[in-house]
From Swiss-Prot:
<dbReference type="GO" id="GO:0015935">
    <property type="term" value="C:small ribosomal subunit"/>
</dbReference>
<keyword id="KW-0488">Methylation</keyword>
<dbReference type="GO" id="GO:0019843">
    <property type="term" value="F:rRNA binding"/>
</dbReference>
<keyword id="KW-0694">RNA-binding</keyword>
<keyword id="KW-0699">rRNA-binding</keyword>
<protein>
    <recommendedName>
        <fullName>Small ribosomal subunit protein uS12</fullName>
    </recommendedName>
</protein>
<comment type="subunit">
    <text>Part of the 30S ribosomal subunit. Contacts proteins S8 and S17. May interact with IF1 in the 30S initiation complex.</text>
</comment>
<comment type="similarity">
    <text>Belongs to the universal ribosomal protein uS12 family.</text>
</comment>
<dbReference type="InterPro" id="IPR006032">
    <property type="entry name" value="Ribosomal_uS12"/>
</dbReference>
<dbReference type="GO" id="GO:0006412">
    <property type="term" value="P:translation"/>
</dbReference>
<dbReference type="InterPro" id="IPR012340">
    <property type="entry name" value="NA-bd_OB-fold"/>
</dbReference>
<dbReference type="Pfam" id="PF00164">
    <property type="entry name" value="Ribosom_S12_S23"/>
</dbReference>
<dbReference type="InterPro" id="IPR005679">
    <property type="entry name" value="Ribosomal_uS12_bac"/>
</dbReference>
<keyword id="KW-0820">tRNA-binding</keyword>
<keyword id="KW-0689">Ribosomal protein</keyword>
<comment type="function">
    <text>With S4 and S5 plays an important role in translational accuracy.</text>
</comment>
<dbReference type="GO" id="GO:0000049">
    <property type="term" value="F:tRNA binding"/>
</dbReference>
Length: 124
């Protein structure tokens, strides 16, 4: 136990909070990366599906797992993608989303509603 004098000199260390999206750093809302693996995985109980995810290599950080939203995609190994924060609740370890319609990932085909979230231009 420290003495009063030691506390006056040094003080106590405050708690450091763990970042929810460490790969984005302090000031980046998005970051670019290269896909190293594109695959499907199954969600936690009680859900059942084949969720599309990709391992993305970010320069200056390492590899993260990112979710590919929407129906259908054209991603493959070495595709360049833009990732944003945002976890997928039923996929453990997936804390990032890939942005549709940016860089190598096309927008969702035949999407009419919520187009801005899936990178689809207005038609007609």
């Amino acid at each position: 136990m420290p003495t009063i004098n030691q506390l006056i000199r040094k003080g106590r260390l405050g708690l450091t909070h763990k970042k929810k999206v460490p790969a984005l750093g302090k000031s980046n809302p998005q970051r670019r990366g290269v896909c190293t693996k594109v695959y499907t995985t199954t969600p936690r109980k009680p859900n059942s599906a084949l969720r599309k995810v990709a391992r993305v290599k970010i320069s200056g950080y390492g590899e993260v797992t990112a979710y590919i939203p929407g129906e259908g995609h054209n991603l493959q190994e070495h595709s360049v993608v833009l990732i944003r924060g945002g976890r997928v609740k039923d996929l453990p370890g997936v804390r990032y989303h890939i942005i549709r319609g940016a860089l190598d990932l096309r927008g969702v085909q035949n999407r009419k509603k919520a187009r801005s979230k899936y990178g689809v231009k207005k038609s007609g």
